[in-house]
Amino acid sequence: MWRIKIKAMKNHDIHHGGYPKESPTGCISKPKPIIICGDLNVAASEIDLKNPKSNRGNAGFSDEERAKFQELLEAGFTDAFRHLYPDREGAYTWWSYRFNARKNNAGWRIDYFITTDDIKDKIKDVIFHSDVFGSDHCPIEMDIDL
């Protein structure tokens, strides 16, 4: 069983001062590894969505959102998928229900496994199950050797 200690923070701390720097994970005490998984609603870079030019500035691909995501990584976290596949294109986890987006693979990668840097080398694979339907997102899976 893992126990996570989270430091109480005021809302403005993140908005004005970035992520706390007193530990590699910001507000979570060492030395326990951390894995964050879920829909973060941000495409981190142009490679993470089909149409970056027409979506620049839109929710999920604004400069501010992308900068905050980058701050998270700089605070001691790793994007597990990009760690293994830095140049892979067309790998998406969300598609609009409109315009046959999923059929045409016109999607966004907005679902993530984020790990603390200390366990990034234990990540074996990250898989997107784009063939599983039932949502506008697909299930994602990470194989990690802890």
Where are these regions (language model features)?
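Active-site regions of metal-assisted phosphoester/phosphodiester hydrolases
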Residues: 1-146
